[in-house]
Amino acid sequence: MLRILFGSLLLSGAMAVSTAAQNAPGVTDREIKIGQTMPYTGPGGWVSSLGQAEKAYMQMINDQGGINGRKINLISADDGYLLWRTGMETRKLIEVDHVAFTFGSLGTTTQLAVARYLNERKIPQLFIESGAYRWGNYKETPYTIGGVRPSYRLGARLYARYILRQDQNAKICILYEDSDFGRDYAAGVRDVLGDKYAATVKEATYEFTDPSVDRQIVELEASGCTALIAAMLPPLAVQTIRKVSDLGWKPLFFMNNVSASVPVVLEPVGVENCIGLLSYAYAKDPLDPTFEDDPGMKDWRAWMSKYLPGEDVRRPSFVNGYNSAATMVQVLKQAGDDLSRENIMRQATNLRDLELPMLLPGIKINTSPTDYYPVQQLQLVRFDGKRWVRFGDLVYDE
């Protein structure tokens, strides 16, 4: 009898160890350790507010007691927006810090550089702060899912359709960074134009390290384009808007959403030079008076005041980081006490009609094992000299 009882205890103990072992590294009864890389310095430092926001949101969750009694320890490492540092810091997060997974790391090129490393080890690479279309390739990178934002390619489709509604014979110019980020814009326009692309579109590209795009802008203006789509990061976006203004060129002008920040891009170039500029939105804008009494906006402002006092509430990265972190928290809530990497990935790809307080009304987050695009709705906006004004209907991916 004692032998049977002892055997049962051994079996019970083995099962307990086995169950506990299912949880990912970095998960204890009191903590969930998460990692990310973020450019707090270097050429991508302008967007470090994303990391600030995500850390601040997790601090709020911890102050509220955490998730199922576990506090979130978000280790946010500075990669300087440099490929070699992204690789080094990611390896450190996994092999030294032993995080459960990565979340909210920034950059298309930088995250592509570590995607294979993470996927081979079946480590979730969640909600990358990038709208690259490739993050939806669930077959090639099943442990990678894109950001809480529309894909760049979807944004380009929206621009192209709007241009054609204004002028069926429009001549379209696209100025873009020669990377996955920029090429997604050309691909989106091609999706709309099909075999008419070559006859309708004039392309100009540049490298991330190029100090200027003035030459490309002059060439595009001389080609007779009536519409210009610019896909670039903020430093060159400032240059582009200024050069277009200096030339007296008046195309139907679209700036990618990444570079639509009023304080980061439009004010440095002079808001008077940006009137009529077009872009798209998917998140609530703190400058939009229609959200003044919105409960979600009020909660967000209270959070900013408490956790990020003195920061510029006009910077969209604080809203985007808030949305991304809220989505990550929902995944962890759905995961319950099964915090294995497999289940975390399963929950990240099973979000159903998730509404966030700082997404535009009507926009919901949906993912599935065969749909890795969390946000597939967006709306056109036009700059009026003070703020971005929404117009038209909410557009769904087609």
Regions found by a protein language model. Give the residues of each.
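Short, low-complexity disordered leader/linker segments with a strong preference
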Residues: 1-33, 397-398
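Beta-alpha junction/loop-to-helix N-cap segments that form part of ligand/metal-binding clefts
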Residues: 23, 31, 46-52, 63-137, ...
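Extracytoplasmic "Venus flytrap"
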Residues: 24-31, 35-55, 77-84, 106-107, ...
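A local structural motif
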Residues: 67-78, 97-100, 197-205, 224-227, ...
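Hydrophobic alpha-helical segments within soluble ligand-binding/sensing domains
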Residues: 86, 147-171, 211-214, 237, ...
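Extracytoplasmic ligand/sensor domains, especially the bilobed periplasmic-binding protein
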Residues: 99-204, 253-279
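Extracellular/periplasmic periplasmic-binding protein-like sensory domains
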Residues: 149, 244-320, 394-397
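Segments of small-molecule ligand-sensing domains
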Residues: 306, 310-319, 329-388
